């Protein structure tokens, strides 16, 4: 069994056609991972969208990470991959039930089919192989506004709840739990609390840096702490900032990037104030056996491309060392372990405060009302356009001129097309979204019941729930 091993997570920013120098950067990412000493044993990648880029990274890291899985999801792919020193025994892709809207095509979250890449890896070599690591790599829905005005906060909260449930299930089986990725949340936010509490895991960074920042220095949540604006070096070493750092060239203004593209060497003093940097990438860890612990954690992949002089991604990596620091608490009592596994004692999750459950339920209620209004408007638009289209077709018969008939037909065609699209979204997508919200709401109500009374709600009687969606 492995005494210690390294893990790494990185958002590669590999958007096809959109990310600049994609091929060169992702190829170099593979080279940098392969040159690490000590090398990582498990790597989780996000925004690795193309098979070509995945293969380039696999080729560069084959000698240290001979096993890997590229996960397929959605229309354009979820961009998730897991690489491993040891064989991947089981694997699956779990898509999030709530994940953006198709109307936000310019954002793409719905089209890529975001979810959780799951892998079961048994660590160690030869006869000493034993413990199973449940690896989860994810990329949560992006926040396009600040909370609480973010219209997607309900989706991101549901996603945090969903991955936390997967983590809790792995914990209940006595496995080592590793959830890594770009969670698009700040520390101690609602989603963060859900993953830690409902998922029964610990934020690896806060284990070693409990007083680290809980947002960018310019954010209200951080200003209330009354701490001075940190410099770039402090943000990396103490705050774990992986995004929006002044050291990352992709966060520079257009003027600086143009100078860089012309071959000019631009350096940034690590003592430069860094008010916008924040931590969006995480490693969550749990071990029900208390056998392994996180002994070190750091921000990595901060180097630049050797020829382009750009950062390798718009995010930095998070890296951690897991070490066997003690004997399993059930090493001398395997029967007790078997009893706890079969009785479900490991599955007794921690509970969030009742007020938190209530706030989530209020969020769901508000969002559900919003989506019902959206559905009514979209279906009304479809009905109105259908009426207009029929009117235009009738008017063609009395049209005195050909060009007037052409304009009526054009109006009918374009208007009805827009109406049909709105009707499909309102009738099909929103209906599906409302059903997913019902499932999420039931989960939260059930968890609240356990937190309050110690018992789940169970199935309600017919008529207790609103079946109309």
Predicted regions mapped to residue ranges:
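N-terminal, active-site-proximal structural segment of metallo-dependent hydrolase catalytic domains
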Residues: 1-59, 325-469
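Cytosol/nucleoplasm-facing, intrinsically disordered, low-complexity tails
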Residues: 1-31, 35-36, 60-61, 124-129, ...
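Active-site beta-strand/loop signature of hydrolases that rely on acidic residues for catalysis
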Residues: 6-13, 25-57, 83, 118-121, ...
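Extended, low-complexity, polar regulatory segments
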Residues: 28, 231-266, 272, 287, ...
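Conserved beta strand-loop-helix elements of the APE1-like EEP
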Residues: 76-91, 120-124, 230-231, 275-291, ...
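Metal-dependent phosphoesterases centered on the DNase I-like endonuclease/exonuclease/phosphatase
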Residues: 149-288, 330-335, 402-419, 426-434
